[in-house]
């Protein structure tokens, strides 16, 4: 399943995160400009990028779990399509109209059949109930469609952070100086936001 794949991604990111932590914290013997720039690059760019990737996949998993449960609690236990509901409501409305026509015809007779009228009225009432319930489901479905994007609200921001991190990671290596060049602080807002979310997660 998609959730299983995402969880595998998260596990891989966490392993990379552990390796980076060991490189930046537990390798005091490594020195020199290249190693120092690599440590700074790892802690300030790669670590937030891995965190953003983990947070993104976790947000997708959470949204995938929440969407069906929200649908069941807000709309119905079965899958509904708006076009089907609209068609069924229109059909119920036509049936109600037909029953009303038959009732009117019966009333216009010289000797109306009151038993038949009563049966038609009962059938009309039942069909009105069906129509009302279908309209309620349609209203709930449309309300759910309007609110469901909120379930995925965090994903767009995290995806943007991942893209910025990837872009910066691809541009950080300076081949002429053989060092990693950190982006200016003004371009690291994504990392600050990710680190803040990471602290909330922990």
Predicted regions and their residues:
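Intrinsically disordered, low-complexity charged segments of secreted bacterial virulence
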Residues: 1-202
